[in-house]
Amino acid sequence: MGKFVVLDHPLIQHKLTIIRRKDTGSNEFRRIVGEIGGLMTYEITRDLPLKDVEIETPMGKTVQKEIAGKKLTIVPILRAGIGMLNGVLDMVPSAKIAVIGMYRDEKTLKPHEYFFKAPKDIAERDCLVVDPMLATGGSANDAIAALKKRGVKEINLAVLVAAPEGIKAVQEANPDVDIYAAAEDEKLMDNGYIFPGLGDAGDRLFGTK
């Protein structure tokens, strides 16, 4: 079973409180979602493997450390996942980007994929799927399935808030995927929103509510 980890760093929790407030405007919401994405990436990548490399500083040659292993691809789920993207890229600017477009049927709450674009060598990369909300788990599971269909072996999921129902759905469908969240929220409401949640993260990010 993949692990579920709440990243309870004080800065993450403080910023999460700001974006939970209903009177936080789109500009501030957008900025802080990106900041949380960056802070989460710092924690998620804590155990990346390192290797020794010889470099030359202005003072002479020395052996130092750099990240080893497969290259990283960030996979935002459209549209709300875009809000976390720049913050993640601030931490790993060399990462490539794969984009998955999903929309949720307002009646059935089921996700539908309408777009997929990824680096040609996606099967050789580790992927970090990012989306602010893990509600039913449908979009996350479909995104993970789309990556696995294209040969990706190592996938992690980063979300801001997660409902217990979504956590369970992802763990049951994808027991090899680790989930990282800024918070595990109380429940999934009948309308498909997370409580206490963030509201509609996409609308709040793009000012379309």
Swiss-Prot record:
Annotated EC: 2.4.2.9
Free-text activity regulation comment from the record: Allosterically activated by GTP.
Main enzyme class: transferase
UniProt cofactor note: Binds 1 Mg(2+) ion per subunit. The magnesium is bound as Mg-PRPP.
UniProt cross-references to InterPro entries, sorted A to Z: PRibTrfase_dom (IPR000836), PRTase-like (IPR029057), Upp_B (IPR034332), UPRTase/APRTase (IPR050054), Ura_phspho_trans (IPR005765)
Cofactor list: Mg(2+)
Short name of one Pfam family: UPRTase
UniProt keyword terms in alphabetical order: Allosteric enzyme, Glycosyltransferase, GTP-binding, Magnesium, Nucleotide-binding, Transferase
Residues annotated as binding uracil: 194, 199-201
Residues bound to 5-phospho-alpha-D-ribose 1-diphosphate: 79, 104, 131-139, 200
PANTHER family: ADENINE PHOSPHORIBOSYLTRANSFERASE, URACIL PHOSPHORIBOSYLTRANSFERASE, CHLOROPLASTIC
Function (record text): Catalyzes the conversion of uracil and 5-phospho-alpha-D-ribose 1-diphosphate (PRPP) to UMP and diphosphate.
Stated name of the protein: Uracil phosphoribosyltransferase
Organism: Lactobacillus helveticus (strain DPC 4571)
Gene that encodes it: upp
